[in-house]
Amino acid sequence: NLAKKFTKNSSVHFLFVGQGDEVELLLKEVSNNKLKNITYLPAVNQKTYFEMLNEFDIGMFSLHSGHKTHNFPGKLLGYMSYSKPILGCVNSGNDLADVVNSAKAGIVVNSNDELGLYKAAKILIDSKSIRNKMGKNGRDLLLSQFSVKSISKQIVSNL
C-alpha cells in the first residue's frame, strides 16, 4: 500500500530483494495495480547485496502484524553498517521500534499504522539531511550495541 501512495513521485522506487514470506502477494499486488515503482529481485549473493545497499537511500523492513515474538531482522545490521536510515513497521509490542526510534536511527511504526508509515516515509524521502543524520545514528547504534566488541563487553560484564 505504501508504494501506491508514491506512484506519482518519480524519485521514489521500491526495490524488494530476497525470498520473504509475502513474495507471491507482492508480485500479485504489483501486477494487479500495475505498479511501476516496485522492482522485485530474487535472492542475490552477499557481495551483490552490499553493492546494492550502497546505492539505496533508505533501508526498509516490515514484520507481519501477526508475529507474537520479538524479531530483529538481520538486514537492519546491514542498513546500519551502511549508514542507511531505517523505515519499518513491526508487530504491536515489539521492542525493535523502541531501539530504532530512541536511537533516532530511523522511524518504525506499528504494522497496522498505514498512515504513520506513509508519514514516516515522506519525512525520510523529503529530507536528505534527516536521512543522513538518522543513517549516522544507526551506524553509531551498530557500533555501540551490536558490534563484536560491544557484545563481548556485555558478555564479560555478565560473567
List the model feature ranges, each with a label.
Residues 116-119, 123, 130-144, 154:
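A short, well-ordered alpha-helix in the C-terminal region of glycosyltransferases
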Residues 45-52, 59-80, 86-98:
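Nucleotide-sugar-dependent
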Residues 1-4:
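Short acidic-capped amphipathic helix/loop micro-motif used as an active-site/signal-coupling element
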Residues 54-55, 102:
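Alpha-helix C-terminal capping/helix-to-coil transition sites in glycosyltransferase folds
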